[in-house]
C-alpha cells in the first residue's frame, strides 16, 4: 500500500470502529469490529493476487455492515468515501424493510432468499466483498465448533437452512460474473465443506 492509501485506510478503520462502538458478535463477547477488520484483511490478501482489487473494494469490505448494523446511511458513506464504496456497501446490505425484521426467526429465510437473488446478477467486486464476508463468518463458525460451542444456537434458523444458504452462496459466486478462481472463493469452499460435514451432535 502507498503512503496515502495507508493514511486513508487508517482513518477508515477508526471511522468503522467508532460506528460499531462496543457492539459484540452475536452470542459472544468478541468485539464486533473484529469481523469487518477480518473481511478487510481477506480482501487485502486477495489484492496481492489480483491488482484489480482497488481501494474502494477494500473500504467496502471494511464498511459492509455499517448500513445494516450501525445505521450509517448509504448517502453518508458516499459523501465520506465515494460513490463506488457506497454502491458496494449497498449491494452487500439488506434493504430497510428486511433489516428491521433481522432478529425475527420467521424472516430469516426470506432475508437470505433476497440476498441470494441479488447475488445472481452481482458484479465481480460485489461478489468479492460478499465472499470475504462469508469467509470470515465461516471461519468464526469453524472456530466455535472446534472449541466445542453449540454454534448453531446463535442462528435464527435450523442447521439445514444454514447449510442450504452457504452452499447456495458458493454456487452463485461461481455463476455469472464468477469469482471461482479467486483464492478467497477456494478458501470459502473448503470452510463450508468442513463446517457442514461435522455431525451436529459434535457441535456442542
Feature locations, PLM:
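Active-site helical microenvironments for divalent-metal-assisted chemistry
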Residues: 1-204
